[in-house]
Regions:
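C-terminal motif of bacterial Sec signal peptides marking the signal peptidase cleavage site
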Residues: 16-19
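Positively charged n-region of N-terminal signal peptides that target proteins for export
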Residues: 1-9
């Protein structure tokens, strides 16, 4: 990305990270230089902590300009939904704009019609921009964007342009996706360098969620690379069971407990509220957890690191494009953000690793950013390696 996007991502992620399309870098024509966003009604001092902004507010006219349509799971999931909504709240609060969140009916069993109804309610409720989280929004968002052409849509975790049936790109939609394989790699590399060799991965979406698949494949690659360097063998349980709805469950906690009881030392909990089940199992079995999407160390003492992506920062940038009048330059496309944009990484403000240091981490992150370390994102190649034995749990 260019200067402004890199700047806003750096500013937001600096709170937890040390600063150091179909391609990884969007085409120049879809990613022009961007001026600073000029807020309509700026506050005297920028708010940087989303927890300082209420989840709900009441607008004077009953209209809400910036809307957020949640993914499955809870709004305050301390992960994907919350990280995305944080961006909505911060942009709105810092620019004097009204905002509201909409949760599709039927919770984890929400249908495409439920998601569309939430977007329709947002559009009819005055939304100028609708931020939708999660790849499962695709069908509903395509329908809503085609109907409400004056509304801008920001589709988080979308790795291609949104098109109509005839292949025409919807110009009022921007897709944002991340190179989760990079932060997954960093997490896998870190835990093996820390001395762990019995690992686990449990992912959401039943194996159909591209972001979770990239996280998991990166985790395997990083662990394998560290093991090869150290001359050790790593074993990893790898499962999509009990994660289709990204929810906590007794079944998931039981499975994770069984892994820990049988020698697993660290589990990467990759799927919203699934974290709660894995963290509970870890706490009961003296195990460790890798968090996902945001820094989850405050949620459990079992967390040793988290594979993070810049959800809040990217949403703020995209909203800024709507309000500075330049959204049309990127509408109908998607952007892919990674290390080069300071958009993925591990949290250093809460660093607890002792054998692999922040300096080590920054050096590896810099290699990813300059392209000298390339992490594969083709998760169809997931398999065991000479240094890592993969146990696919079905």
């Amino acid at each position: 990305m260019k200067k402004f996007l890199a700047l806003i991502l750096a500013l937001v992620m600096a709170l937890s990270l040390v600063a150091c399309g179909n391609n990884a870098t969007p085409p120049e024509t879809t990613d022009p230089d961007t001026p600073d966003v000029q807020p309509e009604n700026p506050t005297t001092e920028a708010i940087t902590n989303a927890d300082d902004v209420a989840d709900e507010m009441t607008s004077e006219d009953g209209k809400y300009e910036i809307a957020f349509v949640t993914d499955v799971g809870q709004l305050k999931d301390k992960s994907f939904n919350q990280g995305t909504f944080d961006g909505v709240k911060l942009y709105a609060a810092n620019n004097g704009l009204s905002y509201k969140y909409y949760q599709p009916a039927n919770g984890d069993q929400a249908t495409d019609d439920d998601r569309y109804d939430a977007m329709k309610a947002a559009a009819e409720g005055g939304a100028k921009v609708i931020v939708a989280a999660g790849f499962m929004q695709a069908t509903a968002l395509t329908k809503a964007a085609a109907e409400f052409t004056d509304v801008k849509f920001v589709f988080v975790d979308r790795d291609s342009a949104v098109t109509t049936e005839d292949g025409t790109a919807l110009k009022n939609v921007l897709g944002i996706c991340f190179q989760e394989e990079q932060c997954g790699y960093l997490a896998g590399y870190a835990v093996v360098k820390e001395g762990y060799t019995k690992l686990g991965f449990t992912g959401g979406g039943g194996g159909d969620n591209p972001a979770c698949c990239r996280y998991g494949y990166g985790f395997v690659q990083g662990a394998s690379a560290a093991a090869a360097e150290m001359g050790v063998k790593v074993e990893m349980n790898y499962s999509w069971l009990y994660g289709a709805s990204f929810s906590a469950s007794t079944e998931l906690q039981t499975m994770a407990s069984g892994w820990y009881e049988n020698g697993t030392e660290v589990i990467f909990a990759c799927g919203g509220n699934m974290f709660q089940s894995v963290a509970a199992a870890a706490a009961a079995n003296d195990g460790a957890v890798v968090g996902v999407d945001v820094d989850q160390s405050s949620q459990s003492e079992t967390v040793i690191t988290s594979a993070m992506k810049g959800l809040s920062a990217s949403v703020q940038w995209a909203c800024g494009k709507v309000y500075d009048g330049s959204f049309d330059e990127i509408g109908g496309t998607f952007v892919t953000l990674g290390a080069k944009d300071n958009a993925v990484g591990l949290p250093t403000a809460t660093w607890s690793l002792t054998k692999w240091t922040v300096d080590d981490y920054n050096a590896m992150l810099a290699k990813m950013a300059d392209g000298s370390l390339v992490v594969d994102n083709d998760y169809s190649k997931l398999d065991s390696t000479d240094s890592l034995t993969l146990n696919l749990v079905k």
